[in-house]
């Protein structure tokens, strides 16, 4: 999320101009600690409705780094609005996910549009969460301005 961008910030070198990498199992954990200390010192808190990532300190950041190295992956951010769209697209297909997992859908679309993901690339998107914030999709669909909203009929 743009409002909770820990992995993207560290992986893309947006903190101290150093790109955090898995480094064959030897990631610079001191960089992670300094990043968290910086957030605390500046009083910076994640700003997202996606409750699964509001903590801003991913419990599995090292697993994420390992996966990025293994897959030659990239890290990007998407807005809360985009995550809601992604969550709704999943819902339109009869499945269910929570808001942060909606980032998977729109993140892939964003990377395709930026031509980072090419037409013939193999892409695997993993949605790790199920719908736990039941009112988020209800509120999304009540607002007909949302891209994929299906408002209730009276």
Which residue ranges define each predicted feature?
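Catalytic phosphate/nucleotide-handling subdomain of diverse soluble enzymes
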Residues: 105-154
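Active-site/ligand-binding loops adjacent to catalytic centers
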Residues: 1-97, 140-154
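Substrate-binding/catalytic subdomain of NAD(P)-dependent oxidoreductase enzymes
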Residues: 84-111, 121-123
């Amino acid at each position: 999320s743009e409002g909770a961008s820990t992995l993207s910030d560290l992986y893309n070198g947006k903190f101290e101009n150093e790109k955090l990498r898995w480094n064959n199992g030897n990631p610079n954990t001191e960089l992670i600690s300094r990043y968290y200390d910086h957030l605390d010192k500046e009083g910076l808190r994640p700003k997202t409705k996606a409750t699964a990532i509001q903590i801003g300190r991913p419990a599995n950041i090292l697993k994420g780094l390992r996966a990025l190295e293994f897959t030659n992956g990239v890290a990007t951010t998407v807005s809360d609005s985009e995550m809601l769209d992604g969550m709704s697209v999943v819902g339109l297909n009869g499945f269910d996910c929570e808001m942060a997992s909606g980032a998977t859908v729109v993140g892939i679309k964003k990377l395709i549009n930026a031509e980072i993901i090419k037409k013939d690339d193999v892409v695997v998107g993993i949605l790790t969460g199920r719908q736990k914030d039941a009112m988020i999709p209800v509120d999304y669909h009540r607002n007909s301005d949302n891209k994929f909203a299906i408002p209730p009929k009276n």
